[in-house]
Curated annotation (Swiss-Prot):
Disulfide bonds: none annotated. The lineage of its organism: Bacteria, Bacillati, Bacillota, Bacilli, Lactobacillales. Its EC number is 2.3.1.234. Fe cation binds at residues 114, 118, 301. This is tRNA N6-adenosine threonylcarbamoyltransferase. GO terms for molecular function: iron ion binding; N(6)-L-threonylcarbamoyladenine synthase activity. It comes from Streptococcus sanguinis (strain SK36). Its cofactor is Fe(2+). It is found in: Cytoplasm. Belongs to the KAE1 / TsaD family. The gene is tsaD. Binds 1 Fe(2+) ion per subunit. Keywords: Acyltransferase, Cytoplasm, Iron, Metal-binding, Transferase, tRNA processing.
Amino acid sequence: MKDRYILAFETSCDETSVAVLKNETELLSNVIASQIESHKRFGGVVPEVASRHHVEVITVCIEEALAEAGISEEQVTAVAVTYGPGLVGALLVGLAAAKSFAWAHDIPLIPVNHMAGHLMAAQSVEPLEFPLLALLVSGGHTELVYVSQAGDYKIVGETRDDAVGEAYDKVGRVMGLTYPAGREIDLLAHEGQDIYDFPRAMIKEDNLEFSFSGLKSAFINLHHNAQQKGEVLSNQDLSASFQAAVMDILMAKTKKALEKYPVKTLVVAGGVAANQGLRERLAAEIQDVKVIIPPLRLCGDNAGMIAYASVSEWNKENFASLDLNAKPSLAFETME
């Protein structure tokens, strides 16, 4: 059988990434051009700046991905691309590049949901057994997803306000940390003590919804009041207390979901899945099901995960026409 090569594009936020996947399982290249340094001084991603950076580096990323994979343009058999959710201008850059490549080589164009990419990055660890449950935690999303089969995703619980990664960045800014703050807070948390009693919203409610705005507000108020009194609080203890509250919420809701939906596998994915505190809690508290977390290099935004998610769409011949447009608010369906 002829080898199949998927060329995948990811430009939903502030990473420009192009990857090559061979025969559904072998990731030959995963080139990522990060823009973090450009956005640090703003304390967050500036959409216009992100779009311009994507335009500047996308062609080089394509060339590097193909060279690293050791294949020519003519050997590519399909193109996969993130079409949402994300920043509209950023998405359009990846879409333009992907559609141009697919048109020029007369090969299928596969549309991929960015969050499906995060989830299916777990496929890089081992073949996934369905049905499974996924906890997706990132800068823009916090959701529990039931996956009956590859490509069939249903939200069973999600945040009512802030995403967990967003909360990390906001409290990080209050502590004077650089953007993005998640990794630094995780490191500080391991050096501090959980001495502040932050709220764990909705933790006892019999649903699978999350809320982090109350926790974020309590953190900001504590820090602000201390500043007004001239007190200096330890960033280590603040981080440890904040992270403990976040993990208590995530673990409580995940355990409830596993009780409601008996599955054999739990996938934990998204940028926050790189958090060591979360990985430690999962290892200590989830023993009855197999927990699969993508490797660190596939937790953040990258095109490799988009390639993995595109496989099920390709097998179903779920191809897009060249008028495929960006869907910045694209979301999984909610379980009825």
